[in-house]
């Protein structure tokens, strides 16, 4: 008990110990977010007459700027590990706000799902997202798939907190890679309006999809955001977790490449780089389930998964290189 108590005190001491060389300005990742914010704000202004909620989008961005500045001031007043963690945590908690925002920006563009579904058919000779859940219907398998999908944000938090507590010198650059990756994907989603099977199959007609017919739905999703009923064991705990998350934040956007697969692949790279076998192999099963689940629950085409893998490799290599320039390891 004495040893445990001593460890707890040591952790608390490190959390609130004033840093000798506190960071003076915004973090690199905060600059990235401000850049994304400015770029998308300009897009809202240029498409103001076509956008559905332009005032709310601009006001939301203004509040994010104020919140970012406020967290910077808190850190400057008390420059310690805890306030730095708070700065990062705030930006992480804002991701669910940024995600549906991509739909508000890309809904004015013509939908491209018919091209992706047709390419999927050419590549695989079928629609894996349509057949996967039909082929394996057992409740246990369904729950495994939904557990994998529901593990998305817990996996991000796990890797982030591991670096914070055990690799603090690399925490800043790790969060730069994770958060910047998100905003790279968001930028892609804005200019590549693909909704994925859960939306396109309903709009095009499941019978058409089963017969290999993929009609162009044009701007259908500009005014429609209803998805198919998610396949799987609907009474399952993890099924309900995913269903609840989709009900609150899902939109017909962000299908290609799969950011779920892309981000978790980047997490695997970071877990490997952490030199912790326990972390890497501990999250590996959930990573595999994630890659399968995106197709099983019809959130993505199979080619979206492939796109997630390829994009993750490219993004990680580029950001890892940039880290050496703008996020040096803090000694």
Locations of regions flagged by a protein language model:
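Interfacial segments of alpha-helical transmembrane regions
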Residues: 85-90, 158-193, 198-212, 283
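N-terminal transmembrane-helix/juxtamembrane module of multi-pass inner/ER membrane proteins
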Residues: 3-64, 82-86, 90-156
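Membrane-interface helix-boundary motifs at transmembrane edges
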Residues: 20-24, 52-55, 75-87, 163-174, ...
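Membrane-interfacial catalytic/cofactor-binding modules of polytopic membrane enzymes
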Residues: 191-273
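Aromatic-anchored segments of alpha-helical transmembrane domains
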Residues: 37-45, 94-100, 182-190, 285-296
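Membrane-embedded catalytic cores of phosphoryl/pyrophosphoryl-handling enzymes
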Residues: 27, 235-331
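Hydrophobic cores of alpha-helical transmembrane segments in multi-pass inner/ER membrane proteins
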Residues: 3-9, 64-76, 154-159, 312-314, ...
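Hydrophobic alpha-helical transmembrane segments
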Residues: 63-67, 148-160, 255-267
